[in-house]
Amino acid sequence: MDLETKMKKMGLGHEQGFGAPCLKCKENCEGFELHFWRKICRNCKCGQEEHDVLLSTEEDRKVGRLFEDTKYTTLIAKLKSDGIPMYKRNVMILTNPVAAKKNVSINTVTYEWAPPVQNQALARQYMQMLPKEKQPVAGSEGAQYRKKQLAKQLPAHDQDPSKCHELSPKEVKEMEQFVKKYKSEALGVGDVKLPSEMNAQGDKVHNPAGDRNTPAAVGSKDKSAEAKKTQYSCYCCKNTMREGDPAIYAERAGYDKLWHPACFICSTCGELLVDMIYFWKNGKLYCGRHYCDSEKPRCAGCDELIFSNEYTQAENQNWHLKHFCCFDCDNILAGKIYVMVRDKPVCKPCYVKNHAVVCQGCHNAIDPEVQRVTYNNFSWHASTECFLCSCCSKCLIGQKFMPVEGMVFCSVECKKMMS
């Protein structure tokens, strides 16, 4: 690929969603404009998933690439035009007749994703067992939740080197090997079935009355109906599964384990595993992001996994050497004074300009290294020139004082004089 083609491809990536409004910042954001390497909006600093960007096709390409060269190729289809694998997302449309005064109207509900099972009644049951605010009904809060989780749990830059910022050939090779490894050893998709169906097939199921690793005996005809109802328990919450309710199985975990639909969550972030896509490691379920975090350091600047042997650690976070930069101006911070603002490093000039509190005495910004006095939302330089009685100008450092909004007084008398 020549340089011109590469630049065109990069430009198109940065044009995607350009100008889309931020759902979080509203009118405070001028519209989405992707930062060159941070994966956030340059205007409001929110992620692309917080903006009203139509990403369904792009997300389907991302998940399609994830399933490529795995046993889940039945969930993808390759476009004839470019051969790019596309996720065959299962969309479920339910129609319910609604009685009206004169005739019967049809109420249609579209789920942007549903479990790919032949039994639609089972898929409907699955959806009803999810919290309402997480059901991916088109145009709803749940659909927006799914969109955010697709972006958060399965970042494209965790599997596609072309989505990363200036990787070396060695880093590209290491990343490709890493992706190949997690596809073969950890990646999976949950399967929705009735526990009784698995029992009838002779599969092992988890028995809450025994050890977690001890499968329940199946096919015993002398069990009472009550015993059958308490035969299955959720691997996550340990509560009993109700008879007739669907359960989720994860093949990599073994079919002796099952989960309630609302309990099929990442063990790190606690969020529903989007589209039941999971990663299994050491007896735990992970989303894609947190599985990768358990294997590789992640740069707090660009959000990419670090495949270089050389990187820096600061403020309990990892950073590419080139990405340990001021969050406001992008200047490299190595060897410079910086201040953490909402867990982001900011250089001293930007801190003073954009974030520093203003002294109530001199009305100038307070430098980060300078001592200050703070009361409620008001601050002063801790100096004899600034922290003074608002009436008589007596220095109040180390003294008792009476605060009144942005003023301080040394005595009741001074306060009365200014009333």
From Swiss-Prot:
Described function: Scaffold protein that may play a role in cell adhesion, cell spreading and in the reorganization of the actin cytoskeleton. Plays a role in the regulation of cell proliferation. May act as a tumor suppressor.
Entry remark concerning the domains of this protein: The N-terminal and the C-terminal halves of the protein can associate with each other, thereby hindering interactions with ZYX.
UniProt subunit comment: Interacts via LIM domain 1 with ZYX. Interacts (via LIM domain 3) with ENAH and VASP. Interacts with ALKBH4, talin, actin, alpha-actinin, GRIP1 and PXN. Interacts (via LIM domain 2) with ACTL7A (via N-terminus). Heterodimer with ACTL7A; the heterodimer interacts with ENAH to form a heterotrimer.
GO biological process: negative regulation of cell population proliferation
GO MF term list: zinc ion binding
CDD domains xref list: LIM1_Testin, LIM2_Testin, LIM3_Testin, PET_testin
Region of interest: Disordered: 133-164, 199-222
Residue ranges of every copy of the PET domain listed in the record: 92-199
GO cellular component: cytoplasm; focal adhesion; protein-containing complex
Family: Belongs to the prickle / espinas / testin family.
Domain LIM zinc-binding as annotated: residue spans: 232-295, 297-357, 360-419
Superkingdom: Eukaryota
InterPro entries: LIM1_Testin (IPR034958), LIM2_Testin (IPR034959), LIM3_Testin (IPR034960), PET_domain (IPR010442), PET_testin (IPR033724), Pk/Esn/Tes (IPR047120), Znf_LIM (IPR001781)
Ranges of biased composition (kind: Basic and acidic residues): 155-164
Locations listed in the record: Cytoplasm; Cell junction, Focal adhesion
Keyword terms: Cell junction, Cytoplasm, LIM domain, Metal-binding, Repeat, Zinc
Protein known as: Testin
Pfam family, one: LIM
